[in-house]
Amino acid sequence: MKASEIRSTFLKFFESKGHQIVGSSPVVPGDDPTLLFTNAGMNQFKDVFLGFDKRPYSRATTSQKCIRAGGKHNDLDNVGYTARHHTFFEMLGNFSFGDYFKHDAISYAWELLTEHFKLPKDKLWVTVYSEDDEAYEIWNKVVGVPAERIVRIGDNKGARYMSDNFWMMGDTGPCGPCTEIFFDHGEGIPGGPPGSPDEDGDRYIEIWNNVFMQFNRTEDGVMHKLPKPSVDTGMGLERITAVLQHVHSNYEIDLFVALLAAAKAAVESAGGKDVDPESPSLKVIADHIRACSFTIVDGVIPGNEGRGYVLRRIARRAIRHGYKLGARTPFFHKIVAELVAQMGEAYPELRAAQARVTEVLKQEEERFFQTIQHGMEILEHALAGGTKQVDGETAFKLHDTYGFPVDLTADVCRERGVTVDQAGFDAAMEHQRSQARAAGKFKMAAGLAYSGAPTAFHGYEHLVCETSKVVAIYVDGTPVDAAQAGDDAAIVLDHTPFYAESGGQAGDSGELRNGSTRVVVADTFKIQADVFGHHGRIVEGSVKVGDSFVAKVDAELRAKTVRNHSATHLMHKALREVLGAHVQQKGSLVNAERTRFDFAHNAPVSDAQIRQVEAIVNAEILANAAASAQVMALDDAQKSGAMMLFGEKYGETVRVLSIGSSKELCGGTHVKATGDIGLFKVVAESGVAAGIRRIEAITGDNALAYLQSLESTVNGVASALKSAVPEVPARISGLQDQVRALEKELAALKGKLASSQGDSLLAQTVDINGLKVLAVVLEGADAATLRTTMDQLKNKLKTAAIVLAAVDGGKVQLAAGVTADSTAKVKAGELVNFVAQQVGGKGGGKPDMAMAGGTDPSKLAAALASVPGWVGERV
């Protein structure tokens, strides 16, 4: 059966069971701001399950377009290198909204798989939640699946109800157990049954998940039975197609065979020569054309933010892989026609948008091909020196100047065994963003043409102005005489208590009221040095130039902000005391949540130094010293010893704030006395650039809540360790000693196990012209065990070429050894690389001993089987 026939069979089967066939929702969720992209069949029915929406049917079936390439669900890095990862996939599903439940859901699934898809019953395994006896009984007694092929899965993710077989929509809300159906590919494929230590192999593949929503979880963690339980199922079309077409990779199904052929032709038409049809890069391109095309169909275009940036990342990743294969002109857009041929019938919107999709992708390619060659040259230069990590500045330059998303750079580096300095990249990105934010504020303010009188600021003394007259209104940057309910506007008042953002302190929020008119002010900024814009939404009534309002600052948020601002001054002084007079402020952000303070210092601030700073600041708070502000001439301020920011421009008169032992020039709002701060706590310390450190701190009730949370965590740890809080460090130290002892014991046991295996493996040697050849897997071995066992086997076999392998966590470890008398003909380094290349890796070493790694355990058996032939060609 073709993929299109499988999709049709699924939908028609459930239609025959009374289900409404519902079209796929867009990959861009229209009514769920919590989702970047649609990533499951149930997304469009979320409000139905939650009881917020009703449909004219209680049974539904869909084939849903899904994307997993951003946010929590992100498969992008794995695509092209595994058999089943995709950025775009189709999720087949059937749903019951308070209609049928477990019996019918399980029976329908079994009937479709065994009677319509003709899957052998003895090839199907199922899992159930360990406490779901009802599902177990249905599978065993009603359907007839033998007990040995039904696996109970418990809470295997570290907490109650945290299980592969228990589904939750969130921390609260509908949830319930699920049952999963697996297909056994047979003994020739490595891997164990679900629930076993080897379950991550490719032998047993999950093809269908049935979720039974029968509980509502409340905030206290209690499970309450739902009055009308529901069913949500999902089966990946690509996976079931691979099973029905008797192939082990999704990229071998008919749909992808066609797309891979089109991708190969497109790349070769753009300069690629004799492209390997098995190349992972072709798989990347074939996968990404689906994600890009359907995202564009649903209204997204490549950009630098949100979904547009995810689309750009996917498209440019595909283009880079084409470039790797030799393409030097646009090629990616040429594959759209084949995609439409394959999927246009099922998704008419794709066929209708073919020309637009092609043009959007072509334009994106043309844009990237202008810079990709130069960018790759820069990246190649960075990689040429044998570095193990590309620095963040280079990665950011590639991103900012040459359009390389950082994960594209990381993709190239990963192929060379090199990493990217993500922290350095993030710091460079944040620096640019902060500059952009500042520029944005300036542009917004500069774009508002204002020539009236300055704003009189009363916010140092008052939080309310009873009569504030509107002197200007701006909507979308345009001056207007009036604004209506629903408008977002910037309003200039003649008098205001609102502090406008400056000096690192966030602008005030609050409200303007006048009879039936109410404006919620979200932010206050400076249009000019002495003209304040109040940015907010008119929620009731209307506003006209000349109207008078009561202007009221949000007192709670102002109080939190001034606590943080005053604490920043005390912290600055304390840092100079503890670290030295070289400490100078380099930037700050003060709002109601916290203070963030950047300063010059060339080393991390130690925990002990942070404790000193906290002690100094909290001592100032306990002293409850009054704060005072004076306006004076700049010369007088300098003579008074007030601290000034180097490079800052000041007017002839300045405002000097004295608080505790601190004296600084500052135009911000502050507490009346240090005691008003309440409590001061540093919560983070980090480096943001060379010679620049950053401290984040909180005050008042935020600091108290933070400490209470820490106390709760420590008490929880103590409870888990069954010890008193003061004894926790010693208890943890004791457990660490135990772990080290157990690890040592485990290593010894592994050595004994390997030794015993080594004796039994001698019988598997093959004699080739007098050279004994052995290529086997050592169960439970690690790299050290492979080396030890290799030495033992070489001593016993005398004249031999040996390859030992171990699989752990989806990775392959290899060791090759050749006895000294045979290295002239067979070299261990060449031998281990021959095997490693077959399992997606590489390695090296000496002629008599070499190590390697690989990423594809599924090909290990074949790789080991090829060793005797390779050796035979050399002896």
From Swiss-Prot:
- UniProt KW keywords: Aminoacyl-tRNA synthetase, ATP-binding, Cytoplasm, Ligase, Metal-binding, Nucleotide-binding, Protein biosynthesis, RNA-binding, tRNA-binding, Zinc
Which reaction equations make up its catalytic activity?
Answer: tRNA(Ala) + L-alanine + ATP = L-alanyl-tRNA(Ala) + AMP + diphosphate
Q: Which coenzymes or cofactors are required?
A: Zn(2+)
Q: Which residues bind Zn(2+)?
A: H565, H569, C666, H670
Tell me the cofactor note. Binds 1 zinc ion per subunit.
Q: What is the recorded name of this protein? A: Alanine--tRNA ligase
Provide a GO biological process annotation.
Answer: negative regulation of DNA-templated transcription
User: Could you tell me which CDD domains the record lists for this protein?
Assistant: AlaRS_core
Its annotated compartments are: Cytoplasm
| Role according to the record | Catalyzes the attachment of alanine to tRNA(Ala) in a two-step reaction: alanine is first activated by ATP to form Ala-AMP and then transferred to the acceptor end of tRNA(Ala). Also edits incorrectly charged Ser-tRNA(Ala) and Gly-tRNA(Ala) via its editing domain.
Q: Which InterPro entries match?
A: aa-tRNA-synth_II/BPL/LPL, Ala-tRNA-lgiase_IIc, Ala-tRNA-ligase_IIc_anticod-bd, Ala-tRNA-synth_IIc_core, Ala-tRNA-synth_IIc_N, Ala-tRNA_ligase, Ala_tRNA_ligase_euk/bac, DHHA1_dom
Give the gene that encodes this protein: alaS
Coiled-coil regions listed: none
GO MF entry, a single one: tRNA binding
Q: List the disulfide bonds.
A: none
Top EC class of this enzyme: ligase
- Could you give the domain comment from the record? Consists of three domains; the N-terminal catalytic domain, the editing domain and the C-terminal C-Ala domain. The editing domain removes incorrectly charged amino acids, while the C-Ala domain, along with tRNA(Ala), serves as a bridge to cooperatively bring together the editing and aminoacylation centers thus stimulating deacylation of misacylated tRNAs.
Q: Which Pfam families match?
A: DHHA1, tRNA-synt_2c, tRNA_SAD
Q: Which organism is it from?
A: Leptothrix cholodnii (strain ATCC 51168 / LMG 8142 / SP-6)
Give the family from UniProt.
Belongs to the class-II aminoacyl-tRNA synthetase family.
What is a single cellular component term in the Gene Ontology annotation?
A: cytosol
Its EC number is 6.1.1.7
Q: Principal localization?
A: cytoplasm
| Highest taxon, organism lineage | Bacteria
